[in-house]
Amino acid sequence: MPSSDSPFLLDVLGERCPMPVQRIRKVIKEISEGSIIHVLGDDPESIHDIPVLLSRLGLEPPIITRQENGWLFEIKV
């Protein structure tokens, strides 16, 4: 896993619920506290599901940026 100053990129483009959330949860368990995860996804459900997951884990809401092919979620662990 990367250090806290190097974002970890998780590409879930083309994956549908529940896979993006399951993969994010796995990375969060393995990554160092203070790290940043960049998630690229295109499942419209992720706009709702990822913030809910982070809230349940006690983490800050993601920064969400619209991309040409979906969304970029910036998650701070």
Give names to the regions the model predicted.
Residues 2-11:
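Right-handed parallel beta-helix/beta-solenoid
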Residues 64-77:
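C-terminal edge-of-domain segments
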Residues 1-3, 30, 64-66:
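Sterically constrained small-residue positions within well-ordered secondary structures
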